[in-house]
From Swiss-Prot:
It catalyses: UDP-N-acetyl-alpha-D-muramoyl-L-alanyl-gamma-D-glutamyl-meso-2,6-diaminopimeloyl-D-alanyl-D-alanine + di-trans,octa-cis-undecaprenyl phosphate = di-trans,octa-cis-undecaprenyl diphospho-N-acetyl-alpha-D-muramoyl-L-alanyl-D-glutamyl-meso-2,6-diaminopimeloyl-D-alanyl-D-alanine + UMP. It is a multi-pass membrane protein. Its EC number is 2.7.8.13. Catalyzes the initial step of the lipid cycle reactions in the biosynthesis of the cell wall peptidoglycan: transfers peptidoglycan precursor phospho-MurNAc-pentapeptide from UDP-MurNAc-pentapeptide onto the lipid carrier undecaprenyl phosphate, yielding undecaprenyl-pyrophosphoryl-MurNAc-pentapeptide, known as lipid I. Pathway: Cell wall biogenesis; peptidoglycan biosynthesis. This is Phospho-N-acetylmuramoyl-pentapeptide-transferase. Its cofactor is Mg(2+). HAMAP family: MraY. It comes from Kocuria rhizophila (strain ATCC 9341 / DSM 348 / NBRC 103217 / DC2201). PROSITE patterns: MRAY_1, MRAY_2. Keywords: Cell cycle, Cell division, Cell membrane, Cell shape, Cell wall biogenesis/degradation, Magnesium, Membrane, Metal-binding, Peptidoglycan synthesis, Transferase, Transmembrane, Transmembrane helix. The chain crosses the membrane at residues 2-22, 55-75, 82-102, 122-142, 162-182, 195-215, 236-256, 263-283, 288-308, 343-363.
Length: 377
């Protein structure tokens, strides 16, 4: 628990003081956001606001994680050090963040809202996602556990194992599955990042949920994962430290990103956070639960899919005034802050529901008994 507080605190400090320094650098070089002309007219006042703030978030997370482990090794050497699972989570986050950085830089250099091509972005994300998918199935620990498995997971691995098709085809199917998750999460966070503080606040809630999930898993590991209520998860405590660092860094960034935003996270931040989200789903064996815990991101993404699909099928008609969903409410006259706070509430309810499902599953596997219930008899 001390490590979690340390990681969150360090992430907060690094971010809240590092972000204004980044703002000055970006402003000095004229690295400001270019606003779409077809977006809400109220957004034109945001033109020129420094972007690429995701650099501050991602670097703060990495720094908080490393410093936490440095202090832990010196103070409590028995707690263990940096793990492969933690590094893989950070690696996917940084890899996707780098794609976002290239996208942001191209927009800035062209001085218009046109970054990497869709095909170019897909190739880069696919390469990074594929590398992650392969790595998580190798490098077993002393007990023979790899960071992830080829089984589709809900609150734990299910009986559906992609390895049924054989080692080669199973690996290919798993790579495709992980890329679907990573593509979905990166695009979902990117679409949500349309109002000041919206994606930042929602991400704080989602990663707080994952911090609690992995912390719970760390307390309920067992040698035989087939036993009731045990979790076959590798290095969950270290994943919880990464999640805590993310929460702290995002809170620090929100100080500057709340309305009126002094800086935007840009694609650097949204794609990086999406990568981290995908990593947690795969490494904590909660891939399908991701749809619930990140429910706000899913709803906003679905609003775009429905809008585009209906527009094509109806030859020009629309379901919403504008997509993503947050812009629909803007055009209905809602204030930006009102939309953001209400969407945060919705995000929090999704996270709470996911935690309820996760804990409910544990109770079912534990025969319905609460921890320590035997002490009451």
């Amino acid at each position: 628990m001390i490590q979690l507080l340390m990681a969150a605190g360090l992430g907060l400090v690094f971010s809240i003081f590092g972000t204004p320094a980044l703002i000055k650098v970006l402003a000095r070089h004229g690295y400001g956001q270019y606003i779409r002309d077809d977006g809400p007219t109220s957004h034109q006042t945001k033109r020129g606001t420094p972007t690429m703030g995701g650099v501050a978030i991602l670097l703060s997370v990495v720094a908080a994680y490393l410093v936490t482990h440095l202090i832990s090794v010196l103070a409590w050497p028995e707690n263990g050090g940096i793990t492969l699972s933690g590094l893989l989570a950070l690696g996917l986050m940084l890899g996707m963040g780098m794609v976002g950085f290239l996208d942001d830089y191209k927009k800035i250099s062209k001085k218009q809202n046109l970054g990497l091509t869709a095909a170019g972005k897909m190739v880069l994300q696919g390469a990074i996602g594929s590398a992650f998918a392969v790595l998580v199935l190798f490098f077993p620990d002393a007990a023979g556990n790899t960071p992830a498995s080829t089984a589709i997971s809900w609150t734990r691995d299910t009986g559906v194992d992609l390895a049924f098709a054989g080692p080669v085809v199973g690996l290919i199917l798993f790579v495709v599955w992980v890329n679907l998750i990573a593509t979905g999460t990166t695009n979902a966070v990117n679409l949500t990042d349309g109002l000041d503080g919206l994606a930042t606040g929602a991400s704080i809630l989602v990663f707080s949920g994952y911090m609690l999930i992995t912390l719970w898993q760390a307390g309920h590991l067992c040698e035989n994962a087939a036993q009731a209520a045990c979790y076959a998860v590798r290095d969950p405590m270290d994943l919880s430290i990464v999640a805590a660092a993310l929460v702290g860094a995002l809170i620090g960034f929100l100080w500057w990103n709340t309305s009126p935003a002094k800086i935007f996270m840009g694609d650097t931040g949204s794609l990086g956070l999406g990568g981290a989200l995908a990593a947690f789903a795969v490494l904590s064996r909660t891939e399908l639960l991701l749809v619930l815990i990140a429910g706000l991101f899913v709803v906003i993404t679905m609003s775009v899919i429905l809008q585009v699909g209906y527009f094509k099928l109806s030859h020009g008609k629309r379901i919403f005034k504008m997509a993503p969903l947050q812009h629909h409410f803007e055009l209905k006259g809602w204030q930006e802050v009102t939309i953001v706070v209400r969407f945060w509430v919705i995000a929090g309810l999704f996270v709470a529901a996911a935690l309820g499902v996760f804990y409910g599953d544990w109770l079912l596997h534990n025969g319905g008994a609460f921890p320590g219930a035997e002490a009451l008899h």
